[in-house]
Amino acid sequence: MNLIKEKRDRKVKGRTCANGSTQRSYVPREEARSPTMSLEALMALLIIFAHEKRATAAFDVPGAYLHADMPEGKFALLRITGQFVDIVCEVNPEFKQDVRYENGTKVLYARILKAIYGMIESALLWYELYVTVLLDEGYEINQYDKCVANKIINGKQCTIGWYVDDNIIGHEDETVIDDQIAKIEAKFPGLAVQKGPNLDFLGMELHFCKDRK
């Protein structure tokens, strides 16, 4: 399945992903349901950041799902057909020996080792990996919203809220934010980072004023 969309900055983004609809008959719902930050939690964070005059930043993790491994013992295949077989073989000629024909069409089967986009369990696998990283860094997951995490640093609360791979972070000290983002980037290289007070987050243009608005 191929998806193409125009982003807000006029860039065109394309993605080839799996067709997860074929999995619904055999993947249990509890293995595919991933938490996402609620609107109420997001609004609460923004109000707290503004009221406490916290420094802020937003960042996203490019190709987030692909950082997560498929569970050990789970076997899944990706069926590549037609012109996409040629593209894959152009990238890695070693795959040419594995190409076969089915009803006159080129077909290449590849074992899936990462949580690729489109698979219905990928969001949960990414969530579990990201939470593990935050816990290792000393964060505590909010008991009321599983996509909000807090950590006390230099006597002040540092908060991260995330919606899949889009994150917003706030702390009184901007250098603390830089340090926390650097630690996350050490795990997931290539973060796209924005520094406050002006942020573009989840389709919203945010501006944190010094007068707590």
Predicted regions and their residues:
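Long, low-complexity, charge-biased intrinsically disordered regions
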Residues: 1-213
